[in-house]
Structure formats: structure tokens, C-alpha cells
């Protein structure tokens, strides 16, 4: 569906040449929800905007449905863009037009008839839950409702690809949840491919099947979302995952804790097994759970626990070895 081949983008400033995207190569499969995550300045938005050529690469290819979009003439590019919907962080609605006219706008630009528009727009507004808002203006809507208008507008020309540029970063938690659920529903119902960027791992975790992690213009990690969370490989990925899982203990608590503190990661079936209770029955140690959580990512369980272990040194060593053998990882983080 989308194939980035050695894509690079540079910007020349008075002081230096900025390498916004560096030699990026990966594919997005048809019908999937694919995420790109990274901190500010990682190159996420710049890369996303190459798909509809709002940013033109200095090098490499961007193939959409087998066509290198960077080589299209103006007319062919206009036609290609009609099938690529885009939603933005700050909605980009026309504030002097009603919700109905905002959704109808791309249809008018593409030459659709008044009959086609009058049939399609109400269907789209019903799809996004805004049938009763057709004749109000954007200024009268909440942030979540504005983004729903943006989604309806992005689908107006029967897009087969939806680009989502930080679609929830300006929303509260409840609106974020509802917008992500709407995107997921549209993806499943119509088979639309979704390429979504975010700086929030929680957004990626809740909706994407695969994710590319970007840092300083490069893709430093790429995997299915469950593997990214349960087995992050790059240090940037590890930092993002740690921040998302938020399994931390204040330094003051660490300083007052005797014995070893072990971070235990459970993956798959091990997250549901009574490993800790088996361990303390097997070895005569005292164990206290300091922090922990179990999550379901892509319908697969993953658990993280921080446990404090006290006892005879040999028993503690043997118990930690037992944990390492029966969980994904067990790491002493404080001794």
C-alpha cells in the first residue's frame, strides 16, 4: 500500500542544513493501522506529509499503490490526493462555513455534483455521529466534535488511505478515546489503510498493529506493537515504553528499601500464571510487590512488576534465577 524507499528530506537554514528525514525505508500494508512515534523533532510529520507530497523528498521513493507519487505530474497528483484523506492536530476547518459545507468542500473541489454531495454528506455526518450538527459552525463545537468533522471531510471522496497527523494531541482523554475508536471502526468497516503519527505511546498502543519509532529523522525501531512494548530494542524505544508504562519508584523509597528490587516482565501466557506465588513456596524468602500492572496490548497480556526480595543470599539468587527462567525477563534494578 505504502512503501518508503530510502526517503530523505533536508531543509537549508541560514545556520545549517537540517536532516529532517534520513534514509527511511519501510512498508505499510493495505488495511492496517500503522503508527509512527517519536519525540518532537523526530521527523514524523515531515515523513507523513511525503505520502500526499505536501513535503517532497530530496531523495528516495514514496510508492502509494505501486506508484511513485514523487514522479506524478500535477494532474495525476491532484487525482491521487483525492483518494488520500488527511486529518490534522488542529482540525484545519473553515470557520466561516457550516459543518455540512466543510464536509462538502473537498467534494465540490473534485467536481462532484450537487446531487452526489447532498446524498454523501449526511451519510458521512451520521458515520461520525454528527447528524444533528450539520448546520452549526466549527466555533460551536467541542474539540472532539471538530475532529469528527475533520474525519468526515477526509472520507468525503471515498479515500482508501487516511493520514492522521497527531489527531488526538489537542483533545482531552475522553475525546481521545472516542476519536481513536471512530478511526478503528472506519478502518474495520471500510478496510481503509491508516497511517497515524503521535508522540504518545498510549495512542499507539490502543489502536495500531505495527509501529515505527523515529529519532532525529531515522527509523530506529520497527515491530508489531506488542513486541515494541514487551521487548523494546533501541534505547529511544525503551525510554518511550518506560514513560508509557510508568512503573517507577521514588528515589526516597528506593533508598529506604532493604534487599534487592527486581523488575519482572511477563509476556503472553506467563502474565496469567501464578509465578510469584510458586516462587515463594519454592524458596524461603520474603517478597513484597512495590509496583505493578498488567495490560492487554493487541489482545495479548503483558505484565510488569517491581518486587522487593529479602532472605538468605543463596535463596534470593535461586529465586531470581527461577524468575528469569519462567518470565520474559527478571532484572535486579536495586541491590
Q: Where do the PLM segments sit?
A:
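Short coil-to-helix segment of the ABC ATPase nucleotide-binding domain corresponding to the Q-loop/switch region
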Residues: 97-104
Amino acid at each position: 500500500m505504502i512503501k518508503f524507499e530510502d526517503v530523505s528530506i533536508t531543509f537549508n537554514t541560514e545556520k545549517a542544513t537540517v536532516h529532517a528525514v534520513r534514509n527511511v525505508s519501510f512498508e505499510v500494508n493495505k488495511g492496517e493501522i500503522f503508527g509512527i512515534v517519536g519525540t518532537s523533532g523526530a521527523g514524523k510529520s515531515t515523513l507523513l506529509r511525503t505520502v500526499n507530497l505536501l513535503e517532497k523528498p530530496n531523495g528516495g521513493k514514496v510508492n502509494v499503490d505501486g506508484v511513485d507519487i514523487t514522479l506524478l505530474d500535477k494532474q495525476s497528483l491532484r487525482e491521487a490526493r483525492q483518494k488520500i484523506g488527511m486529518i490534522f492536530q488542529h482540525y484545519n476547518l473553515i470557520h466561516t462555513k457550516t459543518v455540512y459545507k466543510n464536509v462538502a468542500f473537498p467534494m465540490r473541489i473534485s467536481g462532484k455534483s450537487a446531487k452526489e454531495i447532498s446524498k454523501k454528506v449526511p451519510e458521512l455526518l451520521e458515520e461520525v455521529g454528527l447528524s444533528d450538527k450539520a448546520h452549526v459552525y466549527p466555533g460551536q463545537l467541542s474539540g472532539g466534535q471538530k475532529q469528527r468533522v475533520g474525519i468526515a471531510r477526509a472520507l468525503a471522496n471515498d479515500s482508501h488511505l487516511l493520514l492522521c497527523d497527531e489527531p488526538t494531541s489537542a483533545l482531552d482523554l475522553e475525546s481521545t478515546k472516542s476519536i481513536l475508536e471512530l478511526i478503528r471502526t472506519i478502518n474495520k468497516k471500510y478496510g481503509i489503510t491508516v497511517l497515524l503519527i503521535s508522540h504518545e505511546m498510549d495512542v499507539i498502543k490502543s489502536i495500531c498493529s505495527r509501529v515505527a519509532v523515529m529519532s532525529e529523522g531515522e527509523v530506529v525501531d520497527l515491530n508489531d506493537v506488542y513486541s515494541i512494548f514487551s521487548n523494546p530494542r533501541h534505547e529511544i524505544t525503551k525510554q518511550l515504553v518506560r514513560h508509557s508504562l510508568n512503573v517507577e519508584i521514588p528515589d526516597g523509597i528506593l533508598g529506604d528499601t532493604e534487599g534487592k528490587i527486581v523488575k519482572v516482565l511477563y509476556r503472553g501466557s506467563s502474565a496469567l500464571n501464578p509465578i510469584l506465588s510458586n516462587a515463594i513456596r519454592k524458596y524461603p524468602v520474603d517478597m513484597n510487590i512495590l509496583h505493578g500492572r498488567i495490560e492487554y496490548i493487541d489482545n495479548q497480556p503483558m505484565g510488569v512488576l517491581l518486587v522487593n526480595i529479602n532472605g538468605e543470599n543463596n535463596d534470593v539468587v535461586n529465586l531470581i534465577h527461577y524468575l528469569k527462567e519462567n518470565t520474559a525477563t527478571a532484572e535486579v534494578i536495586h541491590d
